[in-house]
C-alpha cells in the first residue's frame, strides 16, 4: 500500500462500508458515504468562492460534524485547513486572518469586514452541485493551527507534512482501524484536531462532544464502545471527583487507550487512574504542535519510572543543555532540546514568528528537565512563563497587552497560580487608577481575549511591575504569592 490523499482515504472508506457511522455529534450522525458525498459538494462550493490548491481556509466553527466537513472539503481542493476558536474576539481573529491571508473564512466572524471571502456557520451548498468525486489533490500542508506565542502576538504553525498518509505501515499513537474514538476537547486545539482526524482516516467512528462534561464522557464511552480517547489532566480530575455511585456505574471495558497530554498530570491523579483502569490502558504523550519530537509512556512504565514522560518516538533526538548551551550529562537538569529526524524545518514553519534554537537545528519547547541513564525524559519546570490551564497554553504577554490597552491601567503582570482543578489559573496583577473597577477591567478584556484567557483573579498594586530594563519578573512575582499563601495557611 502506498501514500493516499485524504480525499482518496475518505472515498475508499465510503466505498468499503458506506453505511457505517463516520461522525456523531449530540443527536446527529453521518455515515461514511454521506460524509464523502457532502464534502464533495461542499468542496465545489468552496471552489466556486475562489479556493484553490495551496490556499488556506480559516475554519472558525465549534465542535460539530460541520467542522469535519469543512476540513475535508478543504483537503479535497488541495488547500490547508487553518482552525481557530469560534469564540475568538474580533481583535484576535483579525490578527490571525491577516497572517494567514486565507482564501475563505468559514464560521464565526463571517459578518466582520475582514477583507476575505466568508461563509457563515451552518452554510448549506447548493443541492444542484454535484457530489461526484473530484480530481485527486494533495494539500502541501495538512494543517496550520495557531498559537498565542510568547510575544503575546499570534502565530500560525504550518505543518510540513502533506495531506497524504499510508497507515498500512504506521498507525499513529496506538490507534486501530474501524474502532470508535471519543473527542472531548476543542477541535481548534492541535491534539484533538490531529488525533481525531487520524482516527477518522483509520475508519474510526468519531464521537465528538460539544464541550467536555465529566459524566457525559463516561456515558458516551459506554454507549459507543469507545476504544481510544485523549484528555487533559483537568478532565481526568473532574471525572475522578464524581461521586463513586456515578463514576463507577458506567462500563468502560471497551476503552483500550486513554491518552493524556498538554499539561503535567499530578502524580496522585495518575495513580488513581492507573488503579482504576489499569496501567496498560493509561498513556501519556509529551510534545509540541511543531512536531519536532514527542515522548510516550504507558502507565505500567510510569510506575517503574515515576514522574517520567517517556522515551522519544520516531527517531527524534533529545539533549539537555545549560545556559551556555553545553550538553549536560544524564540526571542533570537543564533546558530540553529536540531534533526531528529530518532536521530543523522538516516538520513545520511559522507564519508570524521566527524559529530559534541551537546550532544543528535543535529546538526547545521551553521546558526544563533531565534524561536518565535509560533514556527516559523527566520534566521539572517551565523555562518560560507560559501558563498551562486545563490543557490550554496561555501566554502572559498576550493578556498583559490586552490589560494595558485600558487607558486607566499603568502596568500589569500575569502569572499562573497553582490550581487543583485546572493545574494553573490566570492571575492578573494590575497597577491602575482607583477609578477602574475590577468589573470594568474584566468587561474590557472580554472584547480582546478568548474567555479561557481572562484572569480568574485580579490583584491591585500601586508599585511598578517592570524593572528599569522594562522587564516583568513574573517568576519572582509568582514565588512571592506562593510564599504568601503558605504563610496564610
Predicted regions and their residues:
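Conserved ATP/PPi-binding loop(s) of AMP-dependent carboxylate-activating enzymes
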Residues: 312-315, 326-358, 392-394
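AMP-binding/adenylate-forming catalytic core of the ANL superfamily
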Residues: 221, 229, 368-453, 465, ...
Amino acid at each position: 500500500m502506498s501514500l493516499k490523499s485524504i480525499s482518496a482515504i475518505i472515498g475508499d472508506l465510503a466505498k468499503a462500508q458506506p453505511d457505517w457511522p463516520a461522525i456523531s455529534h449530540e443527536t446527529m450522525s453521518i455515515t461514511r458515504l454521506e460524509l464523502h458525498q457532502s464534502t464533495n459538494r461542499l468542496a465545489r462550493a468552496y471552489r466556486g468562492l475562489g479556493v484553490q490548491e495551496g490556499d488556506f481556509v480559516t475554519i472558525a466553527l465549534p465542535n460539530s460534524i460541520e467542522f469535519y466537513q469543512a476540513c475535508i472539503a478543504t483537503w479535497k481542493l488541495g488547500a490547508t485547513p487553518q482552525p481557530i476558536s469560534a469564540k475568538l474576539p474580533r481583535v484576535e481573529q483579525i490578527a490571525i486572518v491577516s497572517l494567514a491571508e486565507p482564501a475563505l473564512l468559514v464560521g464565526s466572524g463571517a459578518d466582520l469586514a475582514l477583507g476575505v471571502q466568508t461563509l457563515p456557520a451552518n452554510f448549506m451548498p447548493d443541492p444542484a452541485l454535484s457530489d461526484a468525486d473530484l480530481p485527486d489533490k494533495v494539500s502541501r500542508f495538512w494543517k496550520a493551527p495557531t498559537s498565542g506565542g510568547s510575544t503575546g502576538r499570534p502565530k500560525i504553525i504550518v505543518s510540513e507534512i502533506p495531506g497524504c498518509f499510508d497507515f498500512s505501515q504506521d498507525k499513529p499513537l496506538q490507534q486501530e482501524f474501524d474502532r470508535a474514538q471519543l473527542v472531548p476537547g476543542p477541535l481548534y486545539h492541535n491534539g484533538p484536531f490531529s488525533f481525531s482526524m487520524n482516527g477518522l482516516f483509520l475508519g474510526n467512528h468519531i464521537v465528538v462532544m460539544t464541550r467536555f462534561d465529566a459524566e457525559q464522557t463516561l456515558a458516551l464511552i459506554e454507549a459507543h464502545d469507545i476504544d481510544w480517547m485523549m484528555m487533559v489532566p483537568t478532565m481526568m480530575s473532574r471525572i475522578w471527583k464524581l461521586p463513586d455511585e456515578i463514576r463507577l456505574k458506567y462500563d468502560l471495558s471497551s476503552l483500550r487507550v486513554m491518552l493524556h497530554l498538554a499539561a503535567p498530570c499530578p502524580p496522585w491523579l495518575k495513580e488513581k487512574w492507573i488503579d482504576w483502569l489499569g496501567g496498560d490502558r493509561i498513556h501519556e504523550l509529551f510534545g509540541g504542535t511543531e512536531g519536532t519530537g514527542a515522548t510516550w509512556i504507558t502507565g505500567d512504565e510510569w510506575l517503574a519510572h515515576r514522574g517520567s514522560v517517556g522515551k522519544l518516538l520516531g527517531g527524534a533526538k533529545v539533549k539537555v543543555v545549560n545556559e551556555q548551551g553545553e550538553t549536560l550529562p544524564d540526571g542533570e537538569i537543564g533546558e530540553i532540546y529536540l531534533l526531528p529526524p529530518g532536521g530543523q524545518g522538516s516538520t513545520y514553519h511559522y507564519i508570524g514568528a521566527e524559529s530559534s534554537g541551537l546550532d544543528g537545528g535543535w529546538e526547545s519547547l521551553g521546558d526544563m528537565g533531565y534524561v536518565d541513564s535509560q533514556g527516559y525524559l523527566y520534566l521539572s519546570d517551565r523555562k518560560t512563563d507560559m501558563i498551562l490551564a486545563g490543557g490550554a497554553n496561555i501566554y502572559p504577554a498576550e493578556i498583559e497587552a490586552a490589560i494595558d490597552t485600558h487607558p486607566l491601567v499603568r502596568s500589569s503582570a500575569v502569572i499562573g497560580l497553582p490550581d487543583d482543578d485546572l493545574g494553573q489559573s490566570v492571575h492578573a496583577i494590575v497597577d491602575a487608577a482607583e477609578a477602574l473597577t475590577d468589573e470594568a477591567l474584566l468587561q474590557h478584556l472580554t472584547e480582546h481575549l478568548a474567555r479561557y484567557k481572562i484572569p480568574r483573579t485580579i490583584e491591585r498594586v500601586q508599585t511598578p511591575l517592570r524593572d528599569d530594563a522594562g522587564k516583568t519578573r513574573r517568576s519572582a512575582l509568582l514565588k512571592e504569592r506562593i510564599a504568601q499563601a503558605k504563610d496564610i495557611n
